[in-house]
C-alpha cells in the first residue's frame, strides 16, 4: 500500500514534532490520519505506517489494537462507544449499551445493515460521574445517556444522515440532468440542429 502525497505531507508534519531519532512517537497521529482518510486502519495500512516510521509492524499493530479509537475494520457513519467500565457499569453503562444494541438490532461491535451505526462497548471515557456516557465518532462526548436521551440521539442522527443522503441524491440527479442537457446541446450543434 502506498499513501498519497497529501497523506505523506500530513505524516511529515507530525513526524517533525519529534527529534529525528524518535519519529516513531508520531505513530498515533499517523494512524489517526489514515483512519480519517480511509475510515479504518487495515493491516495493510498498519504495515505501511510501520515502514514509513521505521518500526516493526507488530509495534504498530499493538497500538492499533490497544486503543479502541482505531477501527480495524470499516464502521458505520456514526460509531457509538458506550462506556462499560466498572464505575459506569454501576451507573447503568451496561444497560445503556444493551438499550442501544436492542434499539438498532445489533450485537456489540456490530453495524446496522444500512451502515449508518456501529455500536461498541468502551473502556473508561473519563466521565464516570456523568454515566452512562457515550462517545460519538471518537469526538463528541455525551453524558447522562439514559434510554430516552439515547432514543432521541439515535433518531436525530438517523434523520440527519437520511437528510444528507437525500440531498446528495438530489444533487447527483441535478448534476446528471445538467450533464445530459449539455450532451444533447453538443449533439444538436454537431448535427446542425441548433444555432
Predicted regions and their residues:
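Feature of Fe-S/electron-transfer and energy-metabolism proteins
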Residues: 1-125, 129-130, 134-195
